[in-house]
Amino acid sequence: MRVLHVAPEAYPLAKVGGLADVVGALPKALRPLGVEAHVLLPWHGGLEARRVGEVAFAFFGREERAPLGERVEGGVRFLLLGVEGFGRERVYGYPDDAERYLRFALAAKEVARGYDLVHAHDWTAALLALYAPTVYTIHNLAHQGLVDPGLFFSWTGLPWSLFHMEALEFYGRVNLMKGGIVFARRVTTVSPSYAEEIQTPEFGMGLDGVLRRHAGKLRGILNGLDTEVFDPGKDPYLPAPYTREDPSGKARAKEAFRERTGLRPPVLAYVGRLDYQKGLDLVLKALPRLLEMGFRLYVQGVGDGGLQEAFLRAEEENPEGVRFLPAYDEAMARLAYAGAEAVLVPSRFEPCGLVQMIASRYGTPPVARAVGGLKDTVEDGRGGVLFETYHPEGLLYGVLRLFRLGAEEMGLRAMEKDFSWEGPARAYREVYREALG
């Protein structure tokens, strides 16, 4: 079985969030199961690859051509499409993102002709479901890909007959994610709990009715973790290796983390995108109380400008209690996972989340909100702590409960959990077989 993963990002070539980790790791896990899976990405600025051909495709009623590159990483074949608009620094965040990714998808459908099945990821690849046998994965329902219908049908050449409530229309606009849900043969999302939540008005982002209508082909498959990449026993970013059986090297990581940050323990760490979805408003509101109780806070990430300003200000006002790194720095992220006393994952909603898995693997217990994939991955009271209420008091309660139960012991128990891709890969192979009938 030959499967083409089509996505905007994949580790280690381009990474913004957890989607990249999934797309980079799943093909490796599928290989032993007899699935030959390749990954197709846009040729983002700065990516090096060997040019292997050219792809002709139609856009806005005329033929365009895009160079096709190839690169092998970790045994996975990555294909890069050099369509117009992608020789830039960032993966997302440009005013013409809809046009860029529609152009990419139209070129991708030509590459997909050589495969049995397309596995399309999020709104950027959703258009493929209208052209090829597709499994469509929703990584985050909040980003749906809304496009002006006049532009959409001019760019793609698709018929206006698709612009109705049972197909692409969504409150007067084209919704690419809705198209993926409607036209894909199978739809997955990244945890069982999130698959249930998105069928409700609270979490459905306006698509809960569509998802309920297509519930028969919807399945929640928990993301795995690339346990070769995230392994404290051989992590090159750590000062010393350690395992659950011999955790002595973790003390070296804590010492190095303290030296790099200047924060004395206990340190609570947040590593990830600066986004209100991630519950960072709770962290800011709870911060004065946390500092009063003797905790320190380490925050690392980029994203929302208002949140970035708030954490810069918090560091200025509390130089001994807060450290903020507004950057993507993998070395410091690994050191935080290993060296902090706990990680905070207080999300408003969370499709799956990888931070809590990585931290658990590194023996650092998470304090997480009981939503989505966090419920499916954090064993409350054993490998971490869950809290229900989206309120600063809920977060404070979770932190205090963790340390009352014993954060260090809970971290060691968290290391027992199997987050590998072996089980999820088998589940995806079954979904592929169903999609191909």
Curated annotation (Swiss-Prot):
One of its GO terms (molecular function) is alpha-1,4-glucan glucosyltransferase (ADP-glucose donor) activity. CDD domains: GT5_Glycogen_synthase_DULL1-like. It catalyses: [(1->4)-alpha-D-glucosyl](n) + ADP-alpha-D-glucose = [(1->4)-alpha-D-glucosyl](n+1) + ADP + H(+). Pfam families: Glyco_transf_5, Glycos_transf_1. Its EC number is 2.4.1.21. Keywords: Glycogen biosynthesis, Glycosyltransferase, Transferase. The keyword Transferase applies. ADP-alpha-D-glucose binds at residue 15. Pathway: Glycan biosynthesis; glycogen biosynthesis. The keyword Disulfide bond does not apply. GO terms for biological process: glycogen biosynthetic process. Synthesizes alpha-1,4-glucan chains using ADP-glucose. PANTHER family: ALPHA AMYLASE DOMAIN-CONTAINING PROTEIN, GRANULE-BOUND STARCH SYNTHASE 1, CHLOROPLASTIC/AMYLOPLASTIC. Belongs to the glycosyltransferase 1 family. Bacterial/plant glycogen synthase subfamily. This is Glycogen synthase. The gene is glgA.
